[in-house]
């Protein structure tokens, strides 16, 4: 069995925003913060895998977990050499627990999608003024060795805001600008059915290609057989449920880490069927509307 080298682990599904490209209301269960006891059990259940990179995020704002500093510390205790990544929406006041988290996080994404009006539209009820206040507070935070970057989800309505946000990034001494073309996380909806994810004008695409192609994340040469999720990754929800990837958050779980081991779950028929479908470029219904696959022509056009 292939070893897991990448983990996407959700420790809370609480969130203070209702972003336009997030389907959390359709897929989450009861609001929950994972207990430190359960978090310890989860880590114990996957510690035999050589995880090299992990993202502590999911359908919630990670920093809303009341013990997220301990969550990060415990993870690094089990996986000291693993690159730990966290994304935050910056819509809160920085406190001592946030400052403590910085000791353990290797890369921190500040999610800033758009400028002023478009930011508040797509990340409602976020306020631009709150973001600016957060950035001002962050100036006094010890970053330790954490690489703090800007993550920008590009859609058909905020393409022209990129340069303004890049200026804000530089003014606040932040790292790389990471542009992610917006995707659909619902397997029942195609990107082509949504104007925000498919309505780019030729002018927009040319602008992205000519000015920002080095900042755009993703691979233009990709097919189902290239999917790393089915071979080397794990996606867990706050309940401990195992799903295949973050592109299909609405899928039925393959199992639960608090009921079966991760290795047992990955050997189950349903899991293996999805894996084999990707490996043979004959995807099952689970992957038929994969938004990453739909993204390939756009990434190819903009020269990624």
Model-derived segments and spans:
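Radical SAM enzyme [4Fe-4S]-AdoMet core and its adjacent flexible, acidic
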Residues: 10, 25, 29-34, 44, ...
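Glycine-rich beta-strand-to-loop/alpha-helix junction loops that act as flexible
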Residues: 56-60, 87-89
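Active-site-adjacent beta->alpha loops and helix N-cap segments on the catalytic face
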Residues: 65
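N-terminal pre-triad scaffold of radical SAM enzymes
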Residues: 1-21, 51-57, 231-240
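Short beta->alpha connector loops
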Residues: 88-94, 154-158
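Local cysteine-cluster metal-coordination motifs and their immediate loop/turn environment
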Residues: 16-24, 244-247, 283-294
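SEC14/CRAL-TRIO lipid-binding/transfer domains and related phosphoinositide-recognition modules
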Residues: 7, 11-12, 34-38, 42, ...
């Amino acid at each position: 069995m292939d070893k897991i080298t990448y983990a996407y682990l959700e420790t809370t599904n609480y969130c203070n925003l209702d972003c336009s490209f997030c389907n959390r209301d359709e897929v989450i269960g009861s609001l929950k913060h994972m207990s430190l006891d359960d978090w310890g059990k989860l880590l114990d259940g996957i510690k035999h895998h050589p995880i090299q990179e992990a993202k502590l995020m999911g359908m919630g704002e990670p920093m809303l977990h009341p013990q997220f500093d301990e969550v990060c510390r415990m993870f690094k205790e089990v996986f000291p050499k693993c690159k730990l990544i966290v994304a935050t929406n910056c819509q809160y006041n920085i406190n001592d627990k946030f400052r403590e988290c910085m000791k353990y996080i290797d890369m921190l994404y500040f999610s800033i999608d758009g400028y002023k009006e478009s930011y508040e539209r797509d990340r409602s009820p976020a306020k631009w003024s709150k973001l600016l206040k957060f950035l001002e507070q962050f100036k006094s935070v010890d970053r330790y060795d954490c690489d703090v970057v800007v993550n920008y989800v590009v859609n058909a309505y905020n393409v022209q805001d990129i340069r303004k946000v890049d200026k804000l990034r530089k003014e606040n001494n932040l790292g790389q600008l990471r542009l992610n073309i917006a995707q659909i996380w619902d397997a029942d909806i195609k990107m082509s059915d949504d104007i925000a994810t498919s309505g780019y004008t030729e002018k927009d695409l040319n602008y992205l290609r000519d000015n920002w192609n080095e900042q755009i994340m993703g691979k233009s040469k990709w097919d189902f057989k290239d999917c790393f999720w089915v071979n080397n990754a794990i996606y867990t929800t706050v309940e401990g449920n195992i799903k295949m990837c973050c592109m299909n958050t609405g899928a039925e779980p393959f199992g639960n880490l608090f009921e079966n081991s991760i290795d047992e779950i990955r050997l189950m028929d349903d899991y293996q069927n999805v894996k084999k479908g990707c490996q043979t470029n004959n995807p099952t219904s689970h992957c038929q509307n994969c938004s990453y696959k739909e993204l390939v022509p756009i990434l190819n056009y903009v020269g990624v």
